[in-house]
UniProtKB/Swiss-Prot annotation:
GO cellular component, one term: ribonucleoprotein complex
Gene source species: Corynebacterium diphtheriae (strain ATCC 700971 / NCTC 13129 / Biotype gravis)
InterPro entries (UniProt xref): Ribosomal_uL5, Ribosomal_uL5_bac-type, Ribosomal_uL5_C, Ribosomal_uL5_dom_sf, Ribosomal_uL5_N
Gene name of the encoded protein: rplE
Keyword Calcium: no
Protein name: Large ribosomal subunit protein uL5
Length: 187
């Protein structure tokens, strides 16, 4: 890419969403307007303790989905009941920032989430009190980068969207404006 390219969700955030949030919460300073800092995609592979080949599939899937090489996560301590030893690989994690983060969020919201069967929206109760949002996906096949015929097994993942919002209301407003499909509150 020789030309300057800005992801469309980032452009929409800068041009439309920031002004809407400023009007809604009336901030004293433009630096107080919440934004997205990073997106962390975590894939736990507990079965890798018994079969070490399973972690390779998770690493490949995460690489395809995020476009970035995942970090191998290892067990911090041994747990005999799970047949787990300290240092064994049990998961993979990717931290996305900058343009890759905006591209991933755009693909997640416009392509992946609508492909989930019987999808009724994300819960808006999974905020951590500081405006960060975490949700889980049960399988990786909703991403179009994954070839359904080549996956060895369905794997879920946790996705955390870290924002600069100071509370849940600001974080919820930011993510709703970005296009996160939250469930409607039933009266």
């Amino acid at each position: 890419m020789s030309e300057n390219y800005t992801p469309r969700l980032k452009t929409r955030y800068r041009e439309e969403i920031r002004t809407k949030l400023n009007d809604e919460f009336s901030y004293e300073n433009v630096m107080q307007i919440p934004g997205v800092v990073k997106v962390v995609v975590n894939m736990g592979v507990g079965d890798a303790a018994r079969d070490s080949k399973l972690i390779n599939g998770a690493l490949e899937d995460l690489t395809l989905i995020t476009g970035q090489k995942p970090e191998l996560r290892r067990a911090k301590k041994s747990i005999a009941n799970f047949k787990l030893r300290e240092g064994m690989p049990i998961g993979a994690r990717v931290t996305l920032r900058g343009d890759r983060m905006w591209e991933f969020l755009d693909r997640l919201l416009t392509v992946a989430l609508p492909r989930i069967r019987d999808f009724r929206g994300l819960s808006d109760q999974q905020f951590d009190g500081h405006g960060n949002y975490t949700f889980g996906l049960s399988e990786q096949t909703m991403f179009y980068e994954i070839d359904v015929d080549k996956i060895d097994r369905p794997r879920g993942m946790d996705i955390t969207v870290v924002t600069t919002a100071t509370n849940n209301e600001e974080g919820r407003a930011l993510l709703r404006e970005l296009g996160f499909p939250f469930k409607k509150a039933d009266a």
